Amino acid sequence: MTEKRTEITIYTDGACSGNPGPGGYGIIILSEKKRQELSGGYKLTTNNRMELMAVIVGLEQLEIPSIVNLYTDSKYIVDAVTKGWAKRWRANSWKRNKKDKAMNPDLWGKLLDLCSKHQVEFSWVRGHSGNIENERCDKLAVKASQKLDLPSDLGYQ
């Protein structure tokens, strides 16, 4: 008998002032039993790294393999996962093609590993269009990016 997987909904967003510049991410995790909000930031990073970090940190919170409905306003993430780009980049030693390297291989590797543990359905939501949970994630991300004494994003530098 197989164990029924828990269904989880995750909303994520990343923000960066300057790109590169100080950045942050915001996450909302919804389950049958609770709502959890998380955020964090780095002093020098990019918007795409913060979008990726939001998804990674959200998935890292799940203690058991789960069915995840993940909502992000990052077409970069949705397309790279659903169109198989990220898996191809990894298979090609983190190259997009023969001469161009894939960006953020440290984070893409983590994300692909996490996706192999869970059943993740990625969905794109239009940013700043009134989606309440996405708007809240944006506020969390911006606030996190404005904190003092943010750590370094070692993968970026």
Swiss-Prot record:
Cofactor: record remark: Binds 1 Mg(2+) ion per subunit. May bind a second metal ion at a regulatory site, or after substrate binding.
Sequence ranges assigned to domain RNase H type-1 in this UniProt record: 4-146
Gene Ontology molecular-function annotations: magnesium ion binding; nucleic acid binding; RNA-DNA hybrid ribonuclease activity
Enzyme class: hydrolase
Domain of life: Bacteria
Co-factor(s): Mg(2+)
Chain segments annotated as coiled-coil in the UniProt record: none
Enzyme Commission designation: 3.1.26.4
Catalytic reactions of this protein: Endonucleolytic cleavage to 5'-phosphomonoester
Keyword Magnesium set for record: yes
Binding site for Mg(2+) 1: D13, E51, D73
InterPro entries assigned to the protein according to its UniProt record, in alphabetical order: RNase_H, RNaseH-like_sf, RNaseH_domain, RNaseH_sf, RNaseHI
Cellular component annotations (GO), alphabetically ordered: cytoplasm
Keyword Amino-acid biosynthesis included in the entry's annotation: no
Locations listed in the record: Cytoplasm
PROSITE patterns: RNASE_H_1
Gene Ontology BP, a term: DNA replication, removal of RNA primer
Keywords of the record: Cytoplasm, Endonuclease, Hydrolase, Magnesium, Metal-binding, Nuclease
HAMAP family (UniProt xref): RNase_H
Subunit structure: Monomer.
Function as written in the Swiss-Prot or TrEMBL entry: Endonuclease that specifically degrades the RNA of RNA-DNA hybrids.
Protein name: Ribonuclease H
Source species: Trichodesmium erythraeum (strain IMS101)
Gene for this chain: rnhA
